[in-house]
Amino acid sequence: MTNKDLELQKREIEILKIWQFPNIIRLLDIFENDTTLFLVLELLPGGDMFDFLQDRGFNIRESQAQVFIKSIATALEYLHSYGIAYRDLKPENILMSSKEDDAEIKLSDFGLSKIIAPNERSDEPFGTISYAAPEVLLGEEYDKSVDLWSLGVVAYLLVSGTLPFDDDNEDLILERAINDDPDYKSPWISKISKEGKHFIKR
């Protein structure tokens, strides 16, 4: 384990030790040997949200998307109340309690999370480019609100089945995230409620 890996794992442990919250994975135990630190986390046999969506052809009901979005938002609100920016929100870090449609979701993988005081800002790079806020991509200072941008990206994916700014070229993703609006003219937009349209466009 490199020093960087150890630092990320220690950061994750400190954050996981803080809370017990329904939509955040629980840390059950910690043990180590001479070379490895082990975390025992609760079992979530449904896999991650990306696989859940992929198994359904990235096509789920709006009502199901609403439940997932609300669960993610309440988890982020809880983290932010403790001054913690999650900083790596993406479907691969959202675990499912089962493979069924009514599965509960829990945030996992807090290695990139960071405590940011109310009047503090950070310019530390992080995360996955398709889900990161423009200020992060530009190397500018940011606060905990960058998680809300990532929530918007995940919400867009849940209702549309696609990412709002997606390309094999990372430079183009950056350019589109900064300069372009997502596609609101595709057929999927006509299939969701007025409230859903309003939320996604925010």
Regions flagged by a language model, labelled:
Residues 34-48:
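Conserved short submotifs of the Hanks-type protein kinase catalytic core
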Residues 68-69:
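Activation segment signature within eukaryotic-like protein kinase domains
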Residues 74-84:
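Protein kinase catalytic-loop region centered on the HRD/HxD motif
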